[in-house]
Amino acid sequence: MNKMNLYLNKRLLKYTFLLCLTFLILGCAKSSKPVEYYMLDASVGIDNNQTLKGDEGPMIGLGPIRLPEYLDRFQMVVAVSENKYKLIDGHRWAEKLDQNISLALFKTLPSQLGTDRMIRYPWPQRPGVDFQVKIDILELNVDQDGQSQLVAQWSIKSKDKTILNKRSTFTAQASTTDIDKMVQAQSECLTQLGQEIVVNLKPLLK
């Protein structure tokens, strides 16, 4: 009789454990939110429906675009203090951030420059490019006050000659809690960078 009771108690404990584990897994599944993905835009407030020149004019190479290691990840980065950052794991970039920045600029710069003769890095060695725009992103985040900031060191080169080498800083009001507003503000900063590149590059294409 004692052996039978012991056997039944063990079975009861086993089923109780499995039942609790099942409820725990179901609870975690219900409470976890799906990851949301975002893309930057470099054409905020810009009309991209401009007539482009075809197979004439100099060829422009966009890139490479380089990021510091702390930004080279899919999770979004938010500044908690001047020297402290946190990752927002539930909100991520839809692709590598350097590729996202490159694509966003590539989609809007041709219309602003009036030419479709632009290729993205890396490009074939031949025929090569006449002008190259290189960008080093030094800062791209939202600070503890909800201010988005983009700091970029960028240059325009022609063959082996550097025509312009400049550091630019752009800001836009974002949010400390609303991810959509953060991405919108970062897109506004990227748009400003693209406009500054156009102002300096367009006169060289004539």
Task: Explain the meaning of each model-derived region.
Residues N2-F17:
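Bacterial N-terminal signal peptides that target proteins for export
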Residues L24-G27:
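C-terminal motif of bacterial Sec signal peptides marking the signal peptidase cleavage site
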Residues A29-D47, Q112-D160:
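Surface-exposed short loop/turn segments
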Residues A29-Q50, T176-K206:
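C-terminal/domain-edge helix-coil "capping" segments
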Residues E56-Q125:
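N-terminal segment of the mature soluble domain
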Residues M59-P64, V77, Q132-D136, Q149-Q153, ...:
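Soluble periplasmic/extracytoplasmic beta-strand elements of cell-envelope proteins
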Residues K84-R92, K161-Q192:
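Short secondary-structure boundary motifs at beta->alpha junctions and helix caps
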